[in-house]
Amino acid sequence: MKLVRFLMKLNNETVSIELKNGTIVHGTITGVDVSMNTHLKAVKLTLKGKNPVTLDHLSVRGNNIRYYILPDSLNLETLLVEDTPRIKPKKPTAGKIPAGRGRGRGRGRGRGRGGR
């Protein structure tokens, strides 16, 4: 399972996120999108070497996140189970020649032969 798909299941979980610049964000996840952008509510934002600031809502861009600190009470086994089974691609049927394969079949003599 991809990390982003796992994180998308963490709605209403309280987590801490450390950013690449050393900032610590502690809040409740309201959503995570496919770019790992994380939206939180009831946030306590602690800039490196500064006093904490309380915010109602905060969105963190995914590429700024260093790591998530998940609560110990979180049941990882149930979250890691994939909800939808993967669909296997269909194999081509026997006896059928796929179009667009090979080099120049059925298109005449080709180029640059000089009429030999």
Swiss-Prot record:
Biased composition regions of type Basic residues, renumbered to the chain: 102-116
Keyword Ribonucleoprotein: yes
Region ranges (8 X 2 AA approximate tandem repeats of G-R): 100-116
Sequence segments annotated as region (Disordered): 85-116
Domain Sm: 2-74
Keyword Ribonucleoprotein listed: yes
GO molecular function terms noted in the UniProt entry: mRNA binding
UniProt superkingdom: Eukaryota
Protein's name in the database: Small nuclear ribonucleoprotein SmD1b
Organism: Arabidopsis thaliana
Taxonomic lineage: Eukaryota, Viridiplantae, Streptophyta, Embryophyta, Tracheophyta
